[in-house]
Amino acid sequence: VHLSDGEKNAISTAWGKVHAAEVGAEALGRLLVVYPWTQRFFDSFGDLSSASAVMGNAKVKAHGKKVIDSFSNGLKHLDNLKGTFASLSELHCDKLHVDPENFKLLGNMIVIVMAHHLGKDFTPEAQAAFQKVVAGVANALAHKYH
């Protein structure tokens, strides 16, 4: 992902203000509620029968933290997203058979949740930069697909 110095600064500033585990849990939870067909990958997570069940589910929260920790690591390697996410791409492609379109949906959920959490601190410039990043991460995660 090619980012200007201003975009990198906007990302660093915004990311420094969020509680990553909360963003990850809420973003994954929202993905499962808004796009219920994505729940099929999480059969072992227990009750996902309603929005409140999903958003309160401890396994959703824990996996959301794993997801956002990987995303956060990607923010440290913006010049090599494909390399950074290569093993996760392979896992999601070869073993889990996740539709790569879901990565784009989750990226958008991350941006939405960040906007919700940061309010006015999530400037249009920060949003534009994060949209580039989540698109780059989705592309990197889809890289191993044939």
Swiss-Prot record:
Family of the protein in this entry: Belongs to the globin family.
PROSITE patterns noted in UniProt: GLOBIN
Modified residue annotations for N6-acetyllysine: K59, K82, K144
S-nitrosocysteine PTM sites in chain numbering: C93
Phosphoserine, modified sites: S44
Record's protein name: Hemoglobin subunit beta
Residue intervals of the Globin domain: 2-146
InterPro entries on file: Globin, Globin-like_sf, Globin/Proto, Hemoglobin_b, Hemoglobin_oxygen_transport
Tissue expression remark: Red blood cells.
Sites where the protein binds heme b: H63, H92
Assembly information from the UniProt record: Heterotetramer of two alpha chains and two beta chains.
Gene Ontology CC terms, in alphabetical order: blood microparticle; haptoglobin-hemoglobin complex; hemoglobin complex
Top-rank taxon: Eukaryota
GO biological process terms, semicolon-separated: hydrogen peroxide catabolic process
MF term (GO), any: heme binding
Residues found modified as N-acetylvaline: V1
SUPFAM superfamilies per UniProt: Globin-like
Assigned keywords, A-Z: Acetylation, Heme, Iron, Metal-binding, Oxygen transport, Phosphoprotein, S-nitrosylation, Transport
Function field: Involved in oxygen transport from the lung to the various peripheral tissues.
